[in-house]
Amino acid sequence: MNDDLLGKEYIANWTLNAKQHFDDGDYEWLCDIIQQCFPEESCKRILELGCGAGYSTLAFLLRDYSVISVDINDEAITHTDNLIKKHDYTSEIKTIDGPDFSQADALLWKKDLVEEWGMIYALTKQQESFKSIDLIVLCNPGGNISRELTLREKDLLTSGGFTCEEICNNIDNGCIDLLHKWAVIYAACALSKATGIPLLIVERETEGEVNRTLVQISNDVNMEIAKAFSRPIKNAPDGGTLLKNTMDTTDQLCWGAAVYLPVDSQ
């Protein structure tokens, strides 16, 4: 399956789940975390790494944040654009090689910003343009990914801490989504370190696994957890993004969130 078809499949599968999370108040909870951790006057512009179906973007806008969202999936960008415009917000879709902050409520960057999902790493080269960003948000990292895409981007995985042997073993064992998830997480942490901007990571797993994941991230990438939060998922969607294939699917799924601060910036 090519990347365009994967993008359409992702939006088709995720939109109903994302709408359910929105209706259940999960994204409101996420906004509450931001307001609890960051005073309103100190956090006005959010950089969202991956907009998905657009419901998290909409939730941010409803709380009066301005949002810059970057996604490699053109279908996700289009869906998000349509969704927020239905709620009377303005947005601009741009294909650019660096941040260009507009007066719109939301600025959506298309995947041509850089090649494939290595885009987050490439953003670290634009540090001077991030002075007006107050918070980076990475929500439920992952998404659909093909075997070919993982192999093509294995250099990013090795720079994120994986050995070539680990990459091959995980691909052979069908754990491609896990590799993709961690590569994106490492990239987001690298961006936070390079810019000195706090990073909010939100993960969806069982309660025990999400806690281990949040701690493991901080240890692996030398990031300090300032605050951590959790919230049970009321209506757990089928095929949720889980860290381990062997996980007992009868366990309660929950949202886990943590505010990460680069240790060097303390």
Regions found by a protein language model. Name each.
Residues K86-K125:
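S-adenosyl-L-methionine
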Residues C43-G52:
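Conserved class I S-adenosyl-L-methionine
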Residues T163-E166, G196-R204:
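Conserved beta-strand signature within the Rossmann-like core of class I S-adenosyl-L-methionine
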Residues T80-D81:
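Conserved SAM-binding loop
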Residues N73:
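Conserved SAM/SAH-binding beta-strand->alpha-helix loop
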Residues D23-S42:
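Conserved alpha-helix/loop element of class I SAM-dependent methyltransferases that forms part
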Residues D134-K154, I167-L178:
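A short SAM/SAH-binding and catalytic strip from SAM-dependent methyltransferases
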Residues A53-D64:
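Conserved SAM-binding loop of SAM-dependent methyltransferases across substrates and taxa
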